Amino acid sequence: MPTINQLVRKGRHSKVTKSKSPALNYSYNSMKKESVFNPAPQMRGVATRVGTMTPKKPNSALRKYARVRLSNLIEVTAYIPGEGHNLQEHSVVLIRGGRVKDLPGVRYHIIRGALDTAGVDGRKQSRSKYGTKKD
């Protein structure tokens, strides 16, 4: 327990929390050619590689992912949710934060139904999460 005098001299410091989706915290100033701290909920990017990866033990699957070069010039790995997708190299995608627990290094999700990404076909429930229109 600190004394009053110690609190007057030093004060209390709040803990600094590290961002779970750091690439969304910066935008790029092309005039100055530098990154600027400017947090955003989503960000646009271009898919540079689309493929599958296998999850950590004890799970087994082929999870779809895309390597995305964001508009702030940072390259990240993003998960493609839902069954089936239409993404190819050079597709323009919108990403949000949110990790995939069994894929190491995947901290972002691609938003279905936005930009070049189509919604999931034939989806009846949880449609808003997968960008599917009402039939």
Curated annotation (Swiss-Prot):
Segments of this protein annotated with the region Disordered: 1-20
Xref: Pfam families: Ribosom_S12_S23
InterPro entries (UniProt xref): NA-bd_OB-fold, Ribosomal_uS12, Ribosomal_uS12_bac
Modified residues (3-methylthioaspartic acid): D102
Classification via SUPFAM superfamilies: Nucleic acid-binding proteins
GO cellular component annotations of the record: small ribosomal subunit
Key words of the record: Methylation, Ribonucleoprotein, Ribosomal protein, RNA-binding, rRNA-binding, tRNA-binding
GO MF annotation terms: rRNA binding; structural constituent of ribosome; tRNA binding
UniProt key word Ribosomal protein: yes
CDD domains the record matches: Ribosomal_S12
A single BP term in Gene Ontology: translation
Residue ranges, compositional bias (Basic residues): 9-18
Domain of life: Bacteria
Gene3D superfamilies reported in the protein's UniProt record: Nucleic acid-binding proteins
Assembly: Part of the 30S ribosomal subunit. Contacts proteins S8 and S17. May interact with IF1 in the 30S initiation complex.
HAMAP family named among the record's database cross-references: Ribosomal_uS12_B
Family as reported in the entry's similarity comment: Belongs to the universal ribosomal protein uS12 family.
Function as written in the Swiss-Prot or TrEMBL entry: With S4 and S5 plays an important role in translational accuracy.
Name the UniProt record assigns to this protein: Small ribosomal subunit protein uS12
Lineage, broadest ranks: Bacteria, Bacillati, Bacillota, Bacilli, Lactobacillales
